[in-house]
Regions:
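Hydrophobic single-pass membrane-targeting/anchoring helices
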Residues: 12-44
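Intrinsically disordered, low-complexity segments used for protein-protein interactions
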Residues: 2, 37-41, 479
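Alpha-helix initiation/capping motif
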Residues: 16-18, 35, 94, 255, ...
Length: 517
């Protein structure tokens, strides 16, 4: 990505790339060698895995008659993925990235607290433009909201290299910040089943699992380096919000690999939470056909994995959208195969959104200006049941003197798809026909992914204003209900919960916004 420097890690030096077939062969290398390699990439893993969980990941195969158990699926009223706690525990709340939070939405809000109370959450980091100061929270940066031990906890990562846990009512720190080695840009994930665990990626190469039951201190239980993949590419960040399905973690990295990790969660004799992770699936997010079409190796995975009916969907910065059937793996087996492939032509960092009928909504950027981008547009609806011709409709989203397309993840609401664009156009598209019903204009770039709760659309702009619009009559341009001025461009996605809105901005702070009294 080249347009905005606030999102991306420094590019890797060019590396020799194995072909897709060669990668599969590599994964099938001798058992002893693979086992040795796998133990070398973990910290905190047991040296004596179970027979099944200790096996190396197998190459993609046809799952045959494997029948998945019912999976977290969309409905006309999306529900959170959580089974053990109340809250918003991952980016967009569930496996289909369609749960936006819980009302009521505030009616006349103001800033009730700022964290920190003064100064900012800032850190030095380097990218292609050099070393500079980054502040606040970025893309996607949606706070987790978790009801925990009688309190509302707000959990998030920030540009000061740290994970923070603060009180939802007053913004006071509830735990000591956990320091990583670089910026945290993505949305952290709280364990949806109630284990005191937090899953977080950082720009320091590491995907981590943190324990939250050690008093006021978060403790690292496990980490996975982006550089441990056989052929890491492009970047070493982990922007995607990890997805936990039962006892499995699904995640894509900017090293362009997709992982399914068996967590083996539990508790020790002292009642402290434990994990014993094992990689069950590890496949590249690209293939030879994509590299040939692109002519370069910019193929990192920055989207958050979506999941429906046993299939994990994700996209990469080369525009490749994939669906991998991992149903057998989630039942304890090894078989997995790619069942869906679609090329958008350009960088696709927004997460795939899945509606209640199983359709996919995909948003791509417009930077390469190639023939494929012109052919399929930048906002599209796909039918994965028709893998040879999945495009249902598409909407072109041109630039205005610069890059076009979308960085934000669209929101599905009733008959509409709400899609903020890089140029500041907020599009409302009929999700059946693909026709634009209405649009708004906000100061660009609008990277914040919209959230909709109780027919109220909430999103931020790059002038630092958080807006709320009335969507109760979706066929008309919505009137603005209120706005709140924050400090700095709002790239992060808001979280709505019980009368409060929580969001960070590039000015350096995270805010609690609600009605006074």
């Amino acid at each position: 990505m080249t347009l905005m420097q606030g999102r991306h890690a420094a590019e890797r030096s060019p590396t020799h790339r194995l072909g897709f077939t060669g990668l599969v062969v590599l994964l099938l290398a001798g058992t002893a060698a693979v086992a040795s390699w796998r133990f070398g990439i973990f910290s905190g893993a047991s040296p004596e895995p179970s027979a099944r969980d200790g096996d190396p990941p197998s190459a993609p195969t046809d799952p045959g008659e494997a029948s998945p158990e019912p999976s977290p699926s969309p409905s006309s009223t999306p529900e959170p993925i959580n089974t053990g706690i109340e809250g918003l525990t991952t980016f967009r709340g569930n496996a289909t990235r369609t749960y936006h939070g819980r009302g009521p939405v505030p009616e006349d809000p103001e800033i009730l607290w700022r964290y920190p109370t003064s100064g900012g959450l800032c850190g030095q980091s380097s990218d292609a433009a050099g070393t500079r100061l980054w502040c606040g929270t970025g893309w996607t940066g949606q706070p987790n909201v978790v009801e925990w031990e009688g309190r509302i906890q707000i959990r998030f990562g920030a540009y000061d290299y740290a994970v923070h846990v603060v009180g939802g009512r007053n913004g006071r720190a509830l735990m000591e910040p956990f320091r990583t080695g670089d910026l945290i840009k993505g949305t952290v994930t709280s364990d949806p089943d109630g284990y005191p665990l937090l899953y977080v990626g950082s720009r320091d190469n590491q995907l981590r699992i943190l324990a939250l039951d050690r008093g006021r201190t978060m403790e690292e239980l496990w980490s996975l380096s982006a550089d441990s993949a056989p052929d890491p590419t492009w970047n070493d960040d982990w922007d995607g919000s990890p997805l936990v399905i039962d006892d499995y973690l699904l995640e894509g990295g900017e090293n362009s690999w997709f992982y399914v990790v068996k967590l083996n969660r539990g508790y020790d004799g002292q009642g402290r939470v434990t994990v014993n992770p094992r990689i069950r699936v590890m496949v590249p997010g690209y293939d030879d056909e994509l590299i040939a079409a692109l002519g370069d190796e910019q193929v990192s995975i920055e989207s958050s994995v979506a999941f429906h009916d046993g299939v994990a969907y994700f996209a990469n910065s080369g525009g490749l959208v994939q669906g991998w059937d991992v149903s057998d793996v989630l039942l304890g087996g090894d078989r997995h195969r790619r069942v869906f492939r679609f090329w958008t032509g350009d960088d696709t960092d927004a997460s795939v959104v899945i509606d209640e009928e199983g359709y996919l909504y995909v948003a791509s950027e417009l930077e390469r200006l190639n023939g494929r981008s012109r052919e399929v547009g930048q906002l599209m609806k796909l039918d994965p049941r028709k893998p040879k011709d999945p495009l249902v409709w598409s909407v072109p989203v041109p630039g205005e003197g610069g890059a076009g397309g979308l960085w934000a993840t669209p929101a599905v609401h009733g008959r509409l798809v709400i899609a903020p664009t890089n140029t500041g156009r907020i599009l409302a598209v009929n999700r059946n026909t693909g026709r634009i019903r209405w649009e708004l204009r906000l100061p660009p770039p609008t990277w914040t992914s919209p959230v909709i709760v109780d027919d109220v659309l909430i999103l931020g702009d790059c002038a630092g204003v958080l807006h709320a619009y009335d969507l109760s009559r979706p066929g008309r341009e919505p009137p603005e209900l209120w706005s709140v001025q924050l400090e700095g461009c709002i790239e992060s996605t808001p979280a709505v919960w019980d009368g409060m809105v929580y969001v960070g901005a590039r000015g350096g702070a995270v805010y609690g916004i609600g009605d006074r009294g």
